[in-house]
Structures are given as C-alpha cells and as structure tokens.
Amino acid sequence: MLLQPAPCAPSAGFPRPLAAPGAMHGSQKDTTFTKIFVGGLPYHTTDASLRKYFEGFGDIEEAVVITDRQTGKSRGYGFVTMADRAAAERACKDPNPIIDGRKANVNLAYLGAKPRSLQTGFAIGVQQLHPTLIQRTYGLTPHYIYPPAIVQPSVVIPAAPVPSLSSPYIEYTPASPAYAQYPPATYDQYPYAASPATAASFVGYSYPAAVPQALSAAAPAGTTFVQYQAPQLQPDRMQ
C-alpha cells in the first residue's frame, strides 16, 4: 500500500499568485468620454466655481483646478468629470465658453486642448499661404524673362529703341559739339593716352558684318554706313 505525501504549506520564500486586476484596484470607471479638459481659466477660478459652471449640463463626479505645487496658484486649466457621456457632450457643445469672465476652451481630455482660433499658432499651413508671401518670407525669387538683347551678347543695341536717336548707332566724330570745347592739347599731358585723331579713326567706322540681319533690316532707309577698308599690307622688298 502506497502512502501519499501530505501537501506542503506555502512558505514565505515562494511567490503567491497575483490577484485579479478587479480585486486589486477595484472596478475603475472608464472616463474616456466623460472627462473634460478646461483650459484658459483665469487665476481666480477655484474648484467650487468650476463645478458651479458645469452643474448646468448634468451631474458632476469631480471638478479640479490644477495648481502649482510650490506657490499654490492656479495654472490656468483644470479637469471636470461628468457623470455620463450625454452630459459631457452637452458641456463640450460650446468649445469656447465664458468662465469667470474669461473666454476658455473646452474639449474631451483624451483629445487634448483645442485652439481658441484657427488663425493662431501654426493652424495655417504653408500650402495655404499666398505665393508672394512665400517669396518674401523664404527668399524665393520669381522667374524673370529677359529680353533678347540682354541674353545675346552679340547684340549691341538695347531691346527697346531710344526715341531721341534717329539711328541705332551712335557715331562719335571729332567735330561733335559736345567735344569741341576740349582742345587737342589736353590729351598731350597723358603719355599713354590716345590722340583724338587715332580714337576717331576707330570710333567713326562701323562693320556691317557684325550686325545681325534683323537689326540691319530694322534700320531706317536713309541711314548710310561708312565702309572701312583695311589697308593692304605690302611685303618688304628684298634688297
């Protein structure tokens, strides 16, 4: 006949099984849709005045104004727990009520604080800004369309013709009245300056080969150009 060993009593060294969450913490009520966050409160708002305001929407389980631990002054926000979800919905129907003479903001606590106005903070996205405002703020320069006379370096005449000039070419001659007041002797004091005759010999001539075809056709019919013929170089005679 076999003898069964007696059951051992649990000693202090062995861990005991954990109790059920309901037995340890009790039955905790879900306040997801009943707890309300109240922000923007004035500093003189107390728990009693906060409760008095929300009593008009239904039964209240708790109304607390958060205060600073060191100074004991209000931090400007609090929490109100309503008895049921319907009362919380009625309390949040007005998102910006007047509490104790100041405009506050009310929303469910799990959703967080709601902004007072859509124009504050970063409520406006960058995509909604006007393009001109983005260019001024972020330094984005607009695209410019340059005229052909600026893009092409070979063109020597501006894109828009000057009304005061009859010809697109400006000829500087020694007989010009603007330069007649300067005597030729004034150029002799600079050893490396070109004489007026030498400068006039290069300025007064034009080269039709370098003029584009479009500009040559746009010139007036009465305008004539002086053809410059380069001197023929003769080889040195052998002696």
UniProtKB/Swiss-Prot annotation:
InterPro entries reported in the protein's UniProt record: Nucleotide-bd_a/b_plait_sf, RBD_domain_sf, RNA-binding_reg, RRM_dom
**Transmembrane residue ranges:** none
Kindly list the places in or outside the cell where this protein is found, as annotated in its UniProt entry. Cytoplasm, Cytosol; Nucleus
What molecular functions are annotated in GO for this chain?
mRNA 3'-UTR binding; mRNA binding; RNA binding
Q: Does the keyword Cell membrane apply?
A: no
Principal subcellular localisation of the protein:
cytoplasm
Q: What does this protein do?
A: RNA-binding protein that specifically bind the 3'-UTR of CDKN1A transcripts, leading to maintain the stability of CDKN1A transcripts, thereby acting as a mediator of the p53/TP53 family to regulate CDKN1A. CDKN1A is a cyclin-dependent kinase inhibitor transcriptionally regulated by the p53/TP53 family to induce cell cycle arrest. Isoform 1, but not isoform 2, has the ability to induce cell cycle arrest in G1 and maintain the stability of CDKN1A transcripts induced by p53/TP53. Also acts as a mRNA splicing factor. (Microbial infection) Essential factor for the splicing of the pre-mRNAs of human parvovirus B19 (B19V) and for the expression of B19V 11-kDa protein, which enhances viral replication.
Q: What is this protein called?
A: RNA-binding protein 38
Query: Native species of this protein?
Result: Homo sapiens
Gene name per UniProt: RBM38
